């Protein structure tokens, strides 16, 4: 079972980002992978919706002890009893690879956690937010520091993002 995490901003998001997130979720499901996310709103909700529309399985790694914040498209809600930042660590550790759609401060934390834990991240650059800016601040455009622990990947389309994520997962199995 392949598990792909989707990270991106919560709250209200522009319609273009809604559509991209939904397309990411749909493509994850069509490729036979399980979608993992923080399970609440924003990018997480639209990605979950896209996966459900394609009959995919959606897991929400939720903050707190209740399912009150879970979006309507979550099949398996997992309450962590943790704050948003700590539940993100569980999301990162539970994912085989992650796709970054847009993003704010919390998404940067998830990106950093993924890098520290050697998890492949594909950054969907046209989605705006930090996804559009990471390359400009990354070390040699591809790393979060000079140790070059794991290369960040960039994609211009959703299909390209999934192709890269799945190939990185396959390489990590070897």
Regions from the language model: what does each represent?
Residues 2, 8-12, 81-159:
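C-terminal binding/interaction regions
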Residues 165-174:
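Short, hydrophobic alpha-helical segments
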Residues 25, 158-163:
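Short, amphipathic alpha-helical "lid/cap" segments that border enzyme active or binding sites
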Residues 36-38, 60-61, 154:
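General beta-strand structural signal in soluble alpha/beta enzymes
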Residues 1-17, 26, 30-31:
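Generic N-terminal amphipathic, Lys/Arg-enriched alpha-helix
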Residues 19, 26, 30, 41-111, ...:
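Acidic/glycine-enriched connector segments
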């Amino acid at each position: 079972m392949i598990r792909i995490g989707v990270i991106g901003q919560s709250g209200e998001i522009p319609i273009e980002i809604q559509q991209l997130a939904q397309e990411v979720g749909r493509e994850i499901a069509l490729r036979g992978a399980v979608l993992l996310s923080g399970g609440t709103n924003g990018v997480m909700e639209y990605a979950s919706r896209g996966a459900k529309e394609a009959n995919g399985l959606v897991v929400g790694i939720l903050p707190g002890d209740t399912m009150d914040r879970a979006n309507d498209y979550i099949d398996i809600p997992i309450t962590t009893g943790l704050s948003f930042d700590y539940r993100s660590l569980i999301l990162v550790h539970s994912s085989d690879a992650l796709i970054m759609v847009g993003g704010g401060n919390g998404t940067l934390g998830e990106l950093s956690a993924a890098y520290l834990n050697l998890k492949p991240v594909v950054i969907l650059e046209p989605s705006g937010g930090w996804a559009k800016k990471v390359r400009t601040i990354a070390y040699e455009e591809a790393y979060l520091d000079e140790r070059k622990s794991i290369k960040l990947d960039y994609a211009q389309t959703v299909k390209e993002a999934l192709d890269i994520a799945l190939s990185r997962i396959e390489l990590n199995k070897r």
